[in-house]
Amino acid sequence: MQEDPLVLIGKMTAKLNERALAVKTAEDWYDGNHPIPDPPPNTPAATDGEARKAYLTMSRLAVTNFLRPIVDVRQRRLNPEGFQFSQSPTSTDTGVWDIYRRNHLDGDSDLAHMAALKTGQGFVIVWPGSDGKAEITIEDPESVIVAYEPGSRRKRKAALKRWVDDDGYVYVTLYTALAIYKYRSAASTTTGLYVAGQSGGSYQLEPRQVPNETWPLRNPYGEVPVFELRANPSVKPSLYGGGTPEFAGVLNEQRKINQTTMLMLVAMEHQSFRQRWVTGWDYPTNEDGTPDKASMVKAGASRLMTLKPYDGQEDKLRVGEFSQADFRPFVDITQMLVTTMCSSSGTPPYAFLLGNLINVASDAMARLEGIQADALEALSWHFGETWSDAMRFALMVEGNEKAKDPVITTVWGEFERRTATEQANLAMMAKAAGAPSTVVFSMFPGVSPSEAKRWKTEAISDQLVAAAAAPAIDVTPDPVPPVPASAG
């Protein structure tokens, strides 16, 4: 028996509020908007307003974001290149790929992967468009959440999408396997007229009528049309899904890097300019005998220092300077922390442009690439399953019998970076081993499955044209010599 939609919306809205806060926090970390720690106690910045302002300014300058490359280097390598069915496991299907490209997913899939890698989850909604064909959209993880059946990580119970439209009203859509319920807040968010305690949270919901649609809208497919891409999911089933950002395990290292940079900036502020000292100097004083700081000699690049020694002690006047601070330890500590981030996150060091990768042996670089390829392969298992389910639903929407295929596999591009020569050699080896021509063609960089099939068709056409233009082969048999008459 299906749960009351408003009760279900109330539960899912509360979880979506928690999820939206976590998503916003993860996106801030990725964007470099890191939380600023409070000033240490017993320091002027903890009590004095001006000192606190200076501390906050310096802390914002100290943010040195090393989290972005962890996500970017993975996202750039995750490129779906087609889908295979159990009936044709050696080639990709052009029909489902046409649906994929018609929905601009050859570009927009990057948005879903980026959202999942940054925040732990991304979402895809599939539903018929106005023309009856499958329409696939990428959704913001702050606005969508999926509820799963208890004990399952795959059986979707319901999904919720919430957003504020241009008119200021809150819109909520509940997706279930039987129907789709569309609501709108009774008041605009710009009026502040909310009713606390309602299922929608701080606003009252009322059914939203859409022209030429029944309410609720029947779901003829018997399946929730919202699909979740989860990055690094837990083995424990979660009622509301979700994953873990790629950089979640190295946030402490990022905090340490920011703190190290902060200390370096403070040292630069106070010790980068060489401090000078003077002995035997008759410094100016006030009437009470205290040093006259206003008349003191001030050091500067455009200033000439003129000093008056004590009477009769001219030979004791000395001027010197302290050595400037050594900032190399700060750089070394930062590099050590970044190396720790590489190890913990499985990100190759070259993603951070570390200087110790100069003249790295090819075997060592291959091992670094292997770490990256393993991480990408693990992500592709989770993401690929979601894309396969979404495309199966799209085929169902369009009445394609291939939706009944029990095995739909997402085909990914190469996870390892190879030179064009290496890739061409690999393709030639595959050809020598008897691989189909479409597989050989698709191994060349930048060649999509549809392009590979076009190459195959043109290659066959060229062979036929060449055969037709070739001179005719004379198939007239050689004359048979006469049999000599037998003697006698």
Model-predicted segments: where are they?
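Extended, helix-rich architectural segments
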Residues: 1-155, 161, 166, 293, ...
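Short coil/turn segments at secondary-structure boundaries
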Residues: 112-115, 127-128, 268-277, 351-356, ...
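Extended, regular secondary-structure scaffolds
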Residues: 117-119, 123-244
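Extended, charged amphipathic alpha-helical segments
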Residues: 207-367, 407-415
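Long, compositionally biased
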Residues: 283, 369-387, 393-394, 463-488
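Hydrophobic, well-ordered secondary-structure elements that form the walls
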Residues: 341, 387, 440-441
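Extended amphipathic alpha-helical segments with heptad-repeat/coiled-coil character used for oligomerization
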Residues: 385, 398-435
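Long, highly charged low-complexity segments enriched in Glu/Asp and Lys/Arg with interspersed Ser/Thr
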Residues: 444-475
